[in-house]
Amino acid sequence: MADPANDRSEREEGGEDDETPPASDGNPSPSANSFTLSNAQTRAREAAQDLLEHQFEGMIKAESNDEGWRTVVEVVERNAVPDTQDIIGRYEITLDGTGDVTGYELLERYRRGDMKEEL
């Protein structure tokens, strides 16, 4: 009678790789589902439009951290003529590792024509 612990012929012939166990919860590893910079930019843009209800102007910063992503976006809070008098709001939007919004905060407001130091 063959010792199952020492009989590897069935596993080797079947082509199955039993060397690497599957994830304990059956889901792919986090690295396989990592939330990329491109995903973070898209999600922050959507969040800015949905949560702030203003016209998205642009993203000026996106950086990853241990919890997910920190982004800084600008939205047009008030249109004016001339457009140099538009009021721009600069917001920080934080996302977790799956892209869910965990918070947002107004950093500052300024007129488009004012010179601003970039973050």
From Swiss-Prot:
GO cellular component: cytoplasm; gas vesicle
Polar residues bias (residue ranges): 26-42
Keywords: Cytoplasm, Gas vesicle, Plasmid
Pfam families attached to this UniProt entry: GvpO
InterPro entries: Gas-vesicle_GvpO
GO biological process: gas vesicle organization
Ranges where the record places region Disordered: 1-48
Induction note: Maximally transcribed in late log phase, probably part of a gvpC1-gvpO1 operon. Has several transcripts with and without other genes in the locus, expressed from early- to late-log but not in stationary phase. Gas vesicles appear earlier when grown in static culture, possibly due to O(2)-limitation.
Biased composition (Basic and acidic residues): 1-12
Subcellular location per the Swiss-Prot or TrEMBL entry: Gas vesicle; Cytoplasm
Mutant lacking the gene: phenotype: Gas vesicle formation is wild-type (strain NRC-1), expressed in situ. No gas vesicle formation, strongly decreased accumulation of gvpACN transcripts (strain PHH1), expressed in H.volcanii.
Function as written in the Swiss-Prot or TrEMBL entry: A minor component of the gas vesicle, also found in soluble extracts. May play a role in transcription and/or RNA stability and in GV assembly. Gas vesicles are hollow, gas filled proteinaceous nanostructures found in several microbial planktonic microorganisms. They allow positioning of halobacteria at the optimal depth for growth in the poorly aerated, shallow brine pools of their habitat. Expression of a 9.5 kb p-vac DNA fragment containing 2 divergently transcribed regions (gvpD-gvpE-gvpF-gvpG-gvpH-gvpI-gvpJ-gvpK-gvpL-gvpM and gvpA-gvpC-gvpN-gvpO) allows H.volcanii to produce gas vesicles. A minimal gas vesicle can be made in H.volcanii by gvpA1-gvpO1 gvpF1-gvpG1-gvpJ1-gvpK1-gvpL1-gvpM1; lack of enough GvpJ1 prevents formation. The same region restores gas vesicle production in H.halobium without the p-vac locus, but it still has the c-vac locus.
More info: Encoded in a 14-gene plasmid locus called p-vac which produces predominantly short, spindle-shaped gas vesicles during all stages of growth.
Similarity field: Belongs to the gas vesicle GvpO family.
Subunit architecture: Forms homodimers, forms a GvpN1-GvpO1 heterodimer, interacts with GvpC1 (via the latter's C-terminus), GvpF1, GvpI1 and GvpL1, might interact with GvpA1.
The name this protein goes by in its record: Gas vesicle protein O1
